Amino acid sequence: TLVESYIDDIGLTSVSLKNLGSSLASDYKRRNEFFKENSLQESVKALEYATNNGIKNLSLYTPYDFAFKYASNALEVPYAATQYEVLDYSIPFYQLVVNGLFDYSGEVINAHDEKGNQWHIMHILETGSNVAFTFSYEDSTELIQTDYKYYYYTEYSKWTQDVKEVISTIDEIGIHGCELTNHQLVANNIYKVTYTG
């Protein structure tokens, strides 16, 4: 498999895998059916191979429950359970389940800076998420005519003040190292969360 070739050829000990553990596909072509159960089995086989062959830190993007035991941390876990307007409000169900199993981060802050630091801080506190930024050392305009043009926001030097603000605010409150145990709606768009530890 692709996972095996990367591990064997490159000798990695830490990897971040975008769809493995968080995507199950199927294909119903005649005489070559591939069901979601087959996809699940192949995913588990790849995750087993990775963890049994030198991968000590495995980052997965919002992994499904079958991948929990392989994950060192989860990336880009959505703050809200759904975007459907018909619901009154959303609870961080995923975070309540995985809190204490592995670390997880929410949205990449500089990829969604239109929401503002305060918005991100409030959602980090509400969900127990880690802070997430994506950075490049070089000027990100170098990426404009490449396949990586969507990383236009990554130049580290432009984000140092935001990083300091967000991290110092979260550290001052001291939620990390604690367990998220309760989430309750107090009033419209006002939530009370409980941490223990």
Regions found by a protein language model. Name each.
Residues L2-G197:
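Active-site-proximal substrate-binding groove within the catalytic cores of carbohydrate-active enzymes
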